């Protein structure tokens, strides 16, 4: 298949450039320095929102225990965690993983897809426990932090993704 071949060539190019430190990212590919720029732009807001949602020391400890990491994580690990969250959101939103992104083009694509998914969301079917990052994002917009805390402990990865969505949509 012609499209499959094109995709394979793009993957090969991206991976080679990553190996030579010309591009960065794991599953998704970013121009050099873009992940750091994204972190500089959003890390503080991201952490602020996380602390607002978790609010209590025990909730924070329980949350990070769910993720199997300590709450006093060093910056390098935090950077990797934020990249992991970004890429999980992108995967859920079916972003093109052959494209080379800047942090702006990446976040723009995510915001565009988020708007589409909010429109598609069937509000009559509200689940009590397993909520998607889009549903958690909407709860965050309403300021339902108590519910978010509970749901976040049940689905820590979904909460991290929702906080990322909220962070990039607030600027």
Task: Please describe what each predicted stretch is.
Residues 1-171:
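Patatin-like phospholipase
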């Amino acid at each position: 298949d012609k499209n499959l071949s094109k995709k394979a060539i793009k993957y090969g190019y991206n991976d080679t450039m990553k190996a030579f430190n010309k591009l960065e990212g794991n599953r998704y590919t970013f121009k050099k320095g873009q992940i750091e720029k994204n972190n500089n732009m959003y890390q503080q807001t991201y952490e602020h929102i996380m602390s607002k949602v978790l609010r209590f020391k025990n909730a924070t400890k329980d949350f990070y225990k769910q993720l199997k990491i300590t709450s006093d994580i060093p910056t390098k690990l935090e950077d990797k965690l934020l990249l992991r969250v970004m890429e999980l959101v992108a995967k859920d939103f079916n972003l093109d993983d052959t494209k080379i992104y800047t942090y702006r083009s990446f976040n723009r694509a995510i915001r565009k897809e988020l708007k589409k998914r909010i429109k598609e969301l069937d509000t009559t079917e509200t689940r009590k426990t397993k909520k998607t990052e889009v549903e958690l994002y909407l709860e965050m917009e309403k300021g339902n932090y108590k519910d978010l805390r509970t749901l976040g402990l049940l689905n820590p990865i979904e909460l991290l993704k929702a906080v990322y969505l909220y962070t990039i949509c607030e600027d």
